[in-house]
Each structure stands twice: as C-alpha cells, then as structure tokens.
C-alpha cells in the first residue's frame, strides 16, 4: 500500500512521538535524523499517542468486520433456506426469490407465452417472432426452435404426457407438434381471425381454442376436425382453459366477462362480470387449494359437500379476482399491480397466488390475508406470461423485453 507524502510525514511524526514518550532516546534521535523531521513542540502535541490510538482502532475495526461477516453468512444461509435458521420452509411455501437463475435470450420479438414440460426438465416459449423455442430450465441451455407459423405465436399447451404440443397463432391456425420428433403433425384451419389461446383437454383427445373472431372451438386431435363451436362472447376471446377433469372450460374476453361452459352441452353455465376492463387471463384453482380458499373466503360448502370449483381472472383493470363458479360469486379482489395483469395462477401448494403484469413485476399473493407478500422486479418491460412447475421449485416468466427468465423458489 502506497502512502501519500502527507500520510508518510504524519506516520513518521507519530512513530517519533512513540519512541520519545516511551524513553527510546537513542532510537528517537537516529529516527528523527533519518526521517529528516524538524521537531516543533506545538505541532508534535497533535501526534501525542496517535500510534497507539491507530493500533487499537484497527483491532476494534477488525473485530467489527468479523462480526459483520458472520452476520452476513447467517443472512445468506437464511436467504437460501427461505426462513430463519433451523426453520426450513415447507416446499408448499416455497416462493420465487430474486435474482433470476437464468435470463434466456434468443427470441427476436416479445415473448407471448412460457410453459413447463410436464415430464422433462424443459420449458417452451412462444413469441411474436413466429417461433417456439425449447430450453432446458435446469442448465439454461437453448435446445431447439420449432418453425411453421407465419405470424405471432400466441399460446402453447402440452398434453398430460408431454408428447404433444399445441400452438396457435395470429396466422389463424392451430398446429399440433410431435414433441418427440419436433415435427408439426397437423394444422387446423377454421377460425376467421387471430387465434389467441389454445389448450389440450385433460383426456388428450381434444383441443380447445379461442379467437379474436369471438368464438371458442373444440377440435379432435386424431383428425384435426372442428367438432364444437361455443358462441356467446361479444368481443375477442383472450384465453380458454379447461378444468382438471375436462367437463368445464373457462374463457375470458375483451367484453370484460369471464364465462364458464359445460363441454358436453356447450351451454354457458356462468357469466362472471365484475371486471371493468378487458379480462386478459384465467386459471382454475387446483383441488389442493380448495380447503385454503374455503377457509379464506368463508364460502359455504354446498349440499354436495364439495367446495368449488374456483377460478382466477386477471384484467386490464389491474385487479385479480377469485370466483366461486358454482354460485357465480366474486370471492375476493386483489389490488396491487400498477398496470394490466397478464398472467395469474395458483401456487402448487395451494396457499398463494402468483401473477405478472405490465408493471414489469412478478407478484406473490397471500390470498388468505388478501395481501401481496412479495414483489419481484422481473423484467425490463411488460411481463406477458408465467408458469409454475408442478413439482420442481421453479417459476418461468416471459416478457416484451424478448427474454425468458427462470426463477428458483425456496
């Protein structure tokens, strides 16, 4: 370490003072001569005892540094375990923690949808660049690109086995891909406008799609034929999602409503209207969350003795709503996002809700207490989509900033 001339001068005077005041006369006079010190009584008072003071303060600082280092290690330990020491969190309570594990670049336009594969450690992203990309979420490696659509890919969905992938696009088609050979095996035509959403039904035999042409269509996987059309929405249908057993489908629209349809009869079982703007996204509650929801909302158990089903919706009115589909009641409204809500889903543990929005954040909600318990500044631009892995501790988000991010939960 190099001392400046002034620091060197001060140190020399402090050493001289130490030698003199401790009776090392001979050493003092030699040192004074060699260091070329001009002794000045007034000036030297300033350096009286300075060397000892510096010495003790260094020891004090060292002790303080060691204390802070051990506190930092403790905090790091707590951060990784997600709770105070010794209190390991239950995986049901794991939530995404910053910073992201990976930020994946490759798309050349906004990312529209991100989903995890149900079996393998891969995830898939769709983009306005007309491609679908496959990534390994554990290593962050890019695996391949699926090309075939000629316009923005709006939504993607796996069947339960992960062998088939469905995609839909602004090119007005739905494509079915063999996810083992990565080839397009079928293209379905029938919508008259942008196809904004697609989902493979739980039984794997049918696909549902929603479009800007205001309809929802059901297609046979085997033949690619359209077997049903659900009409009722008055404007662009933004998203369609089947419930766990495939007996109901929910849809949301620019007409500010959420509708629930009975698949067998095509009848509209419920029309949920409380949002004050376009409803962008919907998500069914898993059965693992039913008891927590009933507890949180005090919703009475029906005569059948079984609560639910429950549905979440996110809107451009910046709110998230939870609905009891059997009664058509809005059970709660979560307020906190500062812009359009673009994605919403239940945490697989059933106690929390995750959402993403055009305010560039990913949020975790403790719906029992109706509060936002964590906000992650997730992207540089609007966050368009999120997915939560069913079994592994990962969340993935996609954004208009063209990146896909993987978040670890703990």
UniProtKB/Swiss-Prot annotation:
Region Interaction with DCX: start-end pairs: 367-409
Region (Interaction with NDE1): 1-66
Tissue: Fairly ubiquitous expression in both the frontal and occipital areas of the brain.
Gene3D superfamilies: 1.20.960.30, YVTN repeat-like/Quinoprotein amine dehydrogenase (2.130.10.10)
Per-repeat ranges for WD: 106-147, 148-187, 190-229, 232-271, 274-333, 336-377, 378-410
GO MF terms, alphabetically ordered: dynactin binding; dynein complex binding; dynein intermediate chain binding; heparin binding; identical protein binding; microtubule binding; microtubule plus-end binding; phospholipase binding
Region called Interaction with NDEL1, residue ranges: 1-102, 388-410
UniProt function note: Regulatory subunit (beta subunit) of the cytosolic type I platelet-activating factor (PAF) acetylhydrolase (PAF-AH (I)), an enzyme that catalyzes the hydrolyze of the acetyl group at the sn-2 position of PAF and its analogs and participates in PAF inactivation. Regulates the PAF-AH (I) activity in a catalytic dimer composition-dependent manner. Required for proper activation of Rho GTPases and actin polymerization at the leading edge of locomoting cerebellar neurons and postmigratory hippocampal neurons in response to calcium influx triggered via NMDA receptors.
Record text on subunit structure and interactions: Component of the cytosolic PAF-AH (I) heterotetrameric enzyme, which is composed of PAFAH1B1 (beta), PAFAH1B2 (alpha2) and PAFAH1B3 (alpha1) subunits. The catalytic activity of the enzyme resides in the alpha1 (PAFAH1B3) and alpha2 (PAFAH1B2) subunits, whereas the beta subunit (PAFAH1B1) has regulatory activity. Trimer formation is not essential for the catalytic activity.
Record remark on domains: Dimerization mediated by the LisH domain may be required to activate dynein.
Family, similarity comment: Belongs to the WD repeat LIS1/nudF family.
Protein name stated in the entry: Platelet-activating factor acetylhydrolase IB subunit beta
Lineage: Eukaryota, Metazoa, Chordata, Craniata, Vertebrata
């Amino acid at each position: 370490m190099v001392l400046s001339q002034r620091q060197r001068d001060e140190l020399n005077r402090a050493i001289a003072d130490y030698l003199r005041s401790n009776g090392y006369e001979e050493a003092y006079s030699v040192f004074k001569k060699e260091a070329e010190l001009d002794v000045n009584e007034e000036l030297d008072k300033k350096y009286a005892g300075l060397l000892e003071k510096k010495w003790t303060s260094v020891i004090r600082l060292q002790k303080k540094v060691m204390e802070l280092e051990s506190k930092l290690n403790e905090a790091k330990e707590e951060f990784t375990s997600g709770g105070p020491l010794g209190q390991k969190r239950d995986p049901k309570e794991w939530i995404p923690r910053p910073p992201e594990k990976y930020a994946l670049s490759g798309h050349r336009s906004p990312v529209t949808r991100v989903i995890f594969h149900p079996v393998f450690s891969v995830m898939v992203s769709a983009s306005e660049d007309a491609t679908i990309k496959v990534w390994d979420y554990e290593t962050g490696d890019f695996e391949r690109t699926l090309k075939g659509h000629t316009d923005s890919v709006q939504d993607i969905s796996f069947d339960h086995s992960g062998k088939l992938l469905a995609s839909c696009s602004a090119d007005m088609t739905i494509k079915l891909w063999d996810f083992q050979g990565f080839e397009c095996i079928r293209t379905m035509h029938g919508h008259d406008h942008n196809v904004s959403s697609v989902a493979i039904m739980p039984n794997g035999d049918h696909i549902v799609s929603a479009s800007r042409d205001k309809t929802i269509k059901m297609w046979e996987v085997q033949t690619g034929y359209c077997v049903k059309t659900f009409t009722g929405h008055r404007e662009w249908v933004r998203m369609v999602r089947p419930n766990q057993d495939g007996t109901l489908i929910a849809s949301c629209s620019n007409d500010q409503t959420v509708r629930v349809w009975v698949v067998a009869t095509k009848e509209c079982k419920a029309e949920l209207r409380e949002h004050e703007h376009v409803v962008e996204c919907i998500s069914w509650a898993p059965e693992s969350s039913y008891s927590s929801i009933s507890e949180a909302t005090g919703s009475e158990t029906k005569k059948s003795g079984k609560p639910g089903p429950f549905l979440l919706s996110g809107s451009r009115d910046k709110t998230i709503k939870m609905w009891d589909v059997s009664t058509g009641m809005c059970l709660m409204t979560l307020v906190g996002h500062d812009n359009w809500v673009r994605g919403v889903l239940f945490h697989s543990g059933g106690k929390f809700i995750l959402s993403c929005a055009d305010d560039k954040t990913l949020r975790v909600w403790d719906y029992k207490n109706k509060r936002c318990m964590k906000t992650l500044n997730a992207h540089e631009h609007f966050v368009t989509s999120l997915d939560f892995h069913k079994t592994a501790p990962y969340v993935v988000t996609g954004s208009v900033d063209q990146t896909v991010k993987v978040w670890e939960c703990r």
